[in-house]
Amino acid sequence: MVLNYDVIIIGGGIVGSMTARFFSRYQLNILLIEKRSDVGSVTSAANTALIHPGYNAVTGSLKAKMNLIANPIWTQLAEELHFSFDRCGDYVVAVGKEELPKLDALYERGKRNGVPGLSLISAEEMRKREPFINPNVSGALFAETGGMIDPFGATLAAAEHAVLNGVEIRTNTEFQDFLFKDDRIIGVKTNNGDYSCRWVINAAGLYSDMVMHKAGVRPDFKITPRKGEYLILDRADFELKSIYFPVPTNVSKGIMATASVHGNTILGPTAREQDDREDKSNTIAGLAEVLSGGKKLIPEVDTRHVIATFAGLRAAGNAPCETPGVDYGHDFIIEIPRKVRGFLNIGGIESPGLTSAPAIALHAIELMRDAGEKFEKKRDWNPVRPARPRFRHMTDAERRQLIEKDPRYGRVVCRCENVTEGEILAEIHAPIPATTYDALKRRTWLGTGRCQGGFDITRVTNILSRELNRSPLAISKKGEASKLLVRPTKILGGSHED
């Protein structure tokens, strides 16, 4: 048995990280374990990057309740934790008169859910607001509380803030099984040893069903990964003003077109269920579907505008809504099961899971309070995570001042995104260190421009090698199985370290 904790959180995605952040407010010894080399690197890093108003969730469901509570919290979180967030509002766009009744239905559902700031607007008004929109638009639903966010940035910010307030995070640490004493969970087994605790919180995302089955809970619950494929367009081609959904289908919210906090336009996602929980590959059929759906909203979209593709997996579950009278079979699970003590179970957190994460964390605290846990506030808890400089967002005067303090901020490593050596070093030596190329990419946005890392990757590899005191051959893209270099090339004079 290694160390003893009050709470162990399994999973470092947005739900696990936000839970760690909110729990760090209290006098608890907390450990978060994440099986990958970085927090937030799966579903929380590859999604549509939106904060939903709440008009889509089925009335009476836990999704609807969590969405409504969490939506306004994001404004304060962005201010305190310093991640990118823009409450620009969002639109559901009808193309053709036959789609207008669906807008009315969404509007009425939003009102029933208590969503503020909803309005139905005319086709003429929609065309005025967004010049790129399909000229055949017949009307739109506008929700002023919708927003775009950096989802990985928010996850990292929450996790780092938790660390700054005393939470311990162990990456490359994979949950294997529970330790029991009678009907109580007293710890977890991992690939790095055993850890004892009084409470375990399951926030394992795509693997949350497997974790709960290990606890002997909900044997019929199943996560089915739902792949969503996306296209990223060059920011020079389109500058959309907001977020644009088509009218939704029974399976998903449809192929949307959205601006992003990084300036690019994003199209997607598809919604295809699969068995593989790791396969995030793109497909020809999937990308063709995204392009076709994107053209329905923004007809000028063309493949020549595409600079990158990606895919993400949503943890779609089959849990029925437990609100009496609500027939809905895909609700969130947030519970303390009766049959096992010391276990708080979170699962099936698909959309609007990102939006709902703060409310899920707060709900977890209330459930544990109801179960008898005492939450005593820390006197020295700091609500703020310090901001780190982002060179591309600074004025010339601010840049000069920063370079005077640290000349490394004057060395541009990624030209497309204007990322400097100073920014890279700050992330390598941050509370949650970036130790791979992709970890730096998610934090600084290097390698995401038109050249897609062609200019910076060798420079970043050298910086990581130097700062981590490792051979360049040991530097990876996203973990041990993804080394960037295979062997030194034949050289004339000097050595491969030069």
Go through each PLM region and give its residues.
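Short beta-strand to alpha-helix junction loop
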Residues: V58, K65-L68, V93-K102, L141-E160, ...
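Helical element adjacent to the flavin cofactor pocket in flavoenzyme catalytic cores
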Residues: L141, T145-W199
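Glycine-rich FAD pyrophosphate-binding loop
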Residues: R25-A46
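N-terminal Rossmann-like FAD-binding beta1-loop-alpha1 element of flavoenzymes
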Residues: D6-L32
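Flavin-dependent oxidoreductases
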Residues: M18, F178-R184, K189-T283, S292, ...
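Dinucleotide-binding Rossmann-like beta1-alpha1 core, especially the glycine-rich loop
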Residues: A49-R129, G254-I255
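Local cysteine-cluster metal-coordination motifs and their immediate loop/turn environment
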Residues: G410-I424, R442-T461
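C-terminal catalytic lobe of FAD-dependent flavoproteins
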Residues: S252, V261-H262, E273, E278-V412, ...
